[in-house]
From Swiss-Prot:
Keywords: Glycoprotein, Glycosyltransferase, Golgi apparatus, Lipid biosynthesis, Lipid metabolism, Membrane, Signal-anchor, Transferase, Transmembrane, Transmembrane helix. Belongs to the glycosyltransferase 32 family. The chain crosses the membrane at residues 31-51. It catalyses: a beta-D-Gal-(1->4)-beta-D-Glc-(1<->1)-Cer(d18:1(4E)) + UDP-alpha-D-galactose = a globoside Gb3Cer (d18:1(4E)) + UDP + H(+); a beta-D-Gal-(1<->1')-ceramide + UDP-alpha-D-galactose = alpha-D-Gal-(1->4)-beta-D-Gal-(1<->1')-Cer + UDP + H(+). Residues 1-30 are cytoplasmic. The lineage of its organism: Eukaryota, Metazoa, Chordata, Craniata, Vertebrata. This is Lactosylceramide 4-alpha-galactosyltransferase. Glycans are attached at N210, N316. Catalyzes the transfer of galactose from UDP-alpha-D-galactose to lactosylceramide/beta-D-galactosyl-(1->4)-beta-D-glucosyl-(1<->1)-ceramide(d18:1(4E)) to produce globotriaosylceramide/globoside Gb3Cer (d18:1(4E)). Also able to transfer galactose to galactosylceramide/beta-D-Gal-(1<->1')-Cer. Globoside Gb3Cer is a glycosphingolipid of the globo serie, one of the major types of neutral root structures of glycosphingolipids, that constitute a significant portion of mammalian cell membranes. One of its GO terms (cellular component) is Golgi membrane. It is found in: Golgi apparatus membrane. Ubiquitous. Highly expressed in kidney, mesenteric lymph node, spleen and brain. It is a single-pass type II membrane protein.
Amino acid sequence: MGISRSDLEETMSKPPDCLPRMLRGTPRQRVFTLFIISFKFTFLVSILIYWHTVGAPKDQRRQYSLPVDFPCPQLAFPRVSAPGNIFFLETSDRTNPSFLFMCSVESAARAHPESQVVVLMKGLPRDTTAWPRNLGISLLSCFPNVQIRPLDLQELFEDTPLAAWYLEAQHRWEPYLLPVLSDASRIALLWKFGGIYLDTDFIVLKNLRNLTNMLGIQSRYVLNGAFLAFERKHEFLALCIRDFVAHYNGWIWGHQGPQLLTRVFKKWCSIHSLKESRACRGVTALPPEAFYPIPWQNWKKYFEDVSPEELAQLLNATYAVHVWNKKSQGTHLEATSRALLAQLHARYCPTTHRAMTMYL
């Protein structure tokens, strides 16, 4: 998908054929051209340095030393009967869920024992006999209402305006293509099937089935699509898909995600600011405490000790907790500590928490 690291390095090592032509012209034009070339070169070098030095997150690298099987606990779940699914997506080729990923799915499965929790992973082949064996897939398979399935993006985007966009996106390089793919996938998924979508860095505290045609406010200026709950073929999602393609810009972080949802909601409600309205025409934007009780700027609070009383007060009006994995990944967590995140693991995903205490 896109341009590989080796392709990018090879491209950068060759001077462009058009460079001599670009350097013709007045001295001012040459200075401007050299500035643009230098800026782009610096940007690409910085990304290559990031690839070489950072690599996979620490917790992801640690996963490969874990056992591949997990003894399933005794679970007394009722038969799945509730309509609608709860979806999780992995749009990269990773097939080895992190502990936070496992906790997200487990907490959703426990909070919705009568609902189907569907985990779609792009890296899984259709042939289940060729699936990798790892702790994450083994643990999540313990839950009778969890289904793990391969994700075919071309099939998902079929018969939507996203199909042509995705075809082109596979042949160009962009810095934020993976998160952009995730942004596109979630709105296409809910538009086609309806249900609830959650990012894999959520911990679900309460049943979400009574939430329909809703999303969450991240701050007073912006919405967030880490949680979405919509009916199938809802016009708001159709508008999001059209806006995604019509105003596409993959070079600005969040332009196809939170910013897209924010501008579409403003258009939907005919408002200029989120302060003017939080519900209109059947779509509701829930307050930050519902899904984002701790702002991303304060993500370290998840790793600080809290008392049970403070925890209860903090999450009194919260349905699910977004952990801001983009910021927190790789941060050490002592599973048996009184840290806020450790307490959430112990209470809402006890099977994952037990695995953490055994293997971390």
